[in-house]
Amino acid sequence: MSEQQTMSELKQQALVDINEANDERALQEVKVKYLGKKGSVSGLMKLMKDLPNEDKPAFGQKVNELRQTIQNELDERQQMLVKEKLNKQLAEETIDVSLPGRHIEIGSKHPLTRTIEEIEDLFLGLGYEIVNGYEVEQDHYNFEMLNLPKSHPARDMQDSFYITDEILLRTHTSPVQARTMESRHGQGPVKIICPGKVYRRDSDDATHSHQFTQIEGLVVDKNVKMSDLKGTLELLAKKLFGADREIRLRPSYFPFTEPSVEVDVSCFKCKGKGCNVCKHTGWIEILGAGMVHPNVLEMAGFDSSEYSGFAFGMGPDRIAMLKYGIEDIRHFYTNDVRFLDQFKAVEDRGDM
């Protein structure tokens, strides 16, 4: 058999083996069989020793051409096998895009967070700045700077969480106001709100908690009047409870303001006619306020003959309870998903 015939038969057999390889592993075995170091094509080179010298270059060229032909067929078959494998995988893993997606539980903002942010947004629009402070506070800022002397009943150990004789968990966010005024060195204006957690030694029940949230506001400047306070609180009431709400100011007493008032809003449920929400009075108490006491201004470094101001404080817990008809303050702090899911639905409707 001539060398030419041998190469022709080898080529035909290689093409058959390549086409019959059904996976990449089988194709690799074919490659080794023909193109490996001990493969059939490499074996052809052994025939060169029996050829005349003038025929050896031509024979070597034909062997290299055969090697290249087989390699090209191998590469083409390799690409085809990869494509077939991918098509099979896609066919087996076909996704029906019309099927409903997997339900994923998504959280939402806590009702207290929503209420606090709503209040903050209002006052940011009025030019106030948000100031945060320490929850562990000095007695000096929590009481003395706010016109609460050592003998005041609010300083009783039974009413506050004292850590040492001079350190306690703040009972209100008013220390933030005191520290802010002190940091201004008697120069106005001051226009801030102070949100945060506060702590009091209350027994937990439906309307009381040892920990709750509070937002206080403070404005100090020249010629600040009671009418400025009233206008601010009217705007707040309308923002929180509806544009047709009215407010009522009742005389009260707070050590750090003079005069002091309790602020009521006309009942948003019965429109002032009387119901269980307003206890049949037509009014709902929402916060306390007043003009900053001259002693508080002086202790913070402000000249009370030149500067005046107003302050107010509210509990977002109570406001959220009123807005959403919540009867127990403890629901805010128990992380009951059944309770919180109700507000996710309200948020989805855009009612919050």
Swiss-Prot record:
Gene Ontology CC annotations of this record: cytoplasm
Family: Belongs to the class-II aminoacyl-tRNA synthetase family. Phe-tRNA synthetase alpha subunit type 1 subfamily.
Gene3D superfamilies attached to this UniProt entry: Bira Bifunctional Protein, Domain 2
Residues binding Mg(2+): 258
Source domain of life: Bacteria
BP term (GO), one: phenylalanyl-tRNA aminoacylation
Cofactor: binding details: Binds 2 magnesium ions per tetramer.
Primary location recorded for the protein, binned into one broad class: cytoplasm
MF GO annotations: ATP binding; catalytic activity, acting on a protein; magnesium ion binding; phenylalanine-tRNA ligase activity; transferase activity; tRNA binding
UniProt-recorded name of the protein: Phenylalanine--tRNA ligase alpha subunit
UniProt keyword annotation of Coiled coil present: no
Known catalytic reactions: tRNA(Phe) + L-phenylalanine + ATP = L-phenylalanyl-tRNA(Phe) + AMP + diphosphate + H(+)
Keyword line: Aminoacyl-tRNA synthetase, ATP-binding, Cytoplasm, Ligase, Magnesium, Metal-binding, Nucleotide-binding, Protein biosynthesis
InterPro entries linked: aa-tRNA-synth_II (IPR006195), aa-tRNA-synth_II/BPL/LPL (IPR045864), Phe-tRNA-synth_IIc_asu (IPR004529), Phe-tRNA_ligase_II_N (IPR004188), Phe_tRNA_ligase_alpha1_bac (IPR022911), Phenylalanyl-tRNA_Synthase (IPR002319), tRNA-bd_arm (IPR010978)
Encoding gene, per UniProt annotation: pheS
Description of how the protein assembles with itself and partners: Tetramer of two alpha and two beta subunits.
Subcellular location: Cytoplasm
Cofactor: Mg(2+)
HAMAP family, per database record: Phe_tRNA_synth_alpha1
Enzyme Commission number(s) of this protein: 6.1.1.20
